[in-house]
Amino acid sequence: MSLLATLGLELDRALLPASGLGWLVDYGKLPLAPAPLGPYEVLGGALEGGLPGGGEPLAGDGFSDWMTERVDFTALLPLEAPLPPGTLPPPSPAPPDLEAMASLLKKELEQMEDFFLDAPLLPPPSPPPPPPPAAAPSLPLPLPLPTFDLPQPPTLDTLDLLAVYCRSEAGPGDSGLSTLPVPQQPPPLAPLPSPARPAPYPSPASTRGDRKQKKRDQNKSAALRYRQRKRAEGEALEGECQGLEARNRELRERAESVEREIQYVKDLLIEVYKARSQRTRST
């Protein structure tokens, strides 16, 4: 048997009454099935040369001592000692004073009532006016086209009826009156020229011509700017050249004057040398 099975058997014996240990003794005499061996567990019979799972352990072997040893499990019981049967449980805390609580509640209610009575009665705030309805976007209505009422010429039927009425009014005996001449129908009026409707898009020819003209104008303006820039550069170079020429003339004149002075000094030195040599010869 394993250690857990042995401990379980000892606990059952300690907890069960003495009257119920008879069947447990009989149960202990039954042969037990061999328990599965763990990696560090061997049977006592195998150690002593007996068969595993059968036979009684030998007296004085290593298993019989600790298997029959009594274990004290009182250390696992709760630390608090149970109350003896004659003692009473500790008294519960006294309930709060109901009269004191009622008086405090009454005072609070009186203070709240005084506060509400002293507060001025303010009229309820009026609700904010509703926002004005958003104006619907008005679409521009098309303007009515002007109508031209042209005087219509009288028709031939109206003229004929008018002539018959005039004859009947003149009478048959009135021969002095001549018949009214039939008025000539006025020439029909020429239709009014309709306003020229602009083309929905420019023609390709005009667009191409506009592009060429625009390109030509751009080239002209670019050439004009180039000529102006070159003219300004030429004028600046010409002014600088004139300044350098004036400086060159001034330096040339100064160099010529210095050269004349040097030649004059040379001539003086030659004359002095000649005069000194003549003086030495004469002496």
Swiss-Prot record:
What is one term from the GO cellular component aspect held by the record? Answer: cytosol
- Localization per Swiss-Prot or TrEMBL: Cytoplasm; Nucleus; Cytoplasm, Cytoskeleton, Microtubule organizing center, Centrosome
Phenotype upon gene inactivation: The majority of pups die within 48h after birth even if there is no major phenotypic differences at birth. Mice reveal a lack of milk in their stomach and show a dramatic loss of mature olfactory sensory neurons.
Which InterPro entries did the record assign?
bZIP (IPR004827), bZIP_sf (IPR046347)
Q: Where is this region: Required for protein stabilization induced by IL1B?
A: 1-21
PROSITE patterns reported for this sequence: BZIP
Q: How is it modified after translation?
A: Acetylated at Lys-29 by EP300, the acetylation enhances the interaction with CEBPB, DNA-binding and transactivation activity. Ubiquitinated by CDC34 and UBE2B in order to be degraded by the proteasome. Cisplatin inhibits ubiquitination and proteasome-mediated degradation by inhibiting the interaction with CDC34. Ubiquitination and degradation by the proteasome are inhibited by NLK in a kinase-independent manner.
Q: Which domain of life is it from?
A: Eukaryota
Which parts of the sequence are annotated with region: Disordered? 118-154, 168-241
**Residues bearing Phosphoserine?**
S257
Main localization category:
cytoplasm
> Any idea which residues bear N6-acetyllysine here?
K29
GO biological process terms, semicolon-separated: cerebellar granule cell precursor proliferation; circadian rhythm; fat cell differentiation; multicellular organism growth; negative regulation of apoptotic process; negative regulation of cell cycle G2/M phase transition; negative regulation of cell population proliferation; negative regulation of DNA-templated transcription
Family (UniProt): Belongs to the bZIP family.
Q: How does it assemble?
A: Binds DNA as a dimer. Interacts with PTP4A1/PRL-1. Interacts with CCND3, but not with CCND1 or CCND2. Interacts with HSPA1A or HSPA1B; the interaction protects ATF5 from degradation via proteasome-dependent and caspase-dependent processes. Interacts (via C-terminal region) with NPM1 (via C-terminal region); the interaction leads to loss of association between HSPA1A or HSPA1B and ATF5 and promotes ATF5 degradation via proteasome-dependent and caspase-dependent processes. Interacts with NLK; the interaction stabilizes ATF5 at the protein level in a kinase-independent manner.
**Under what name is this protein listed?**
Cyclic AMP-dependent transcription factor ATF-5
Q: What's the source species for this entry?
A: Mus musculus
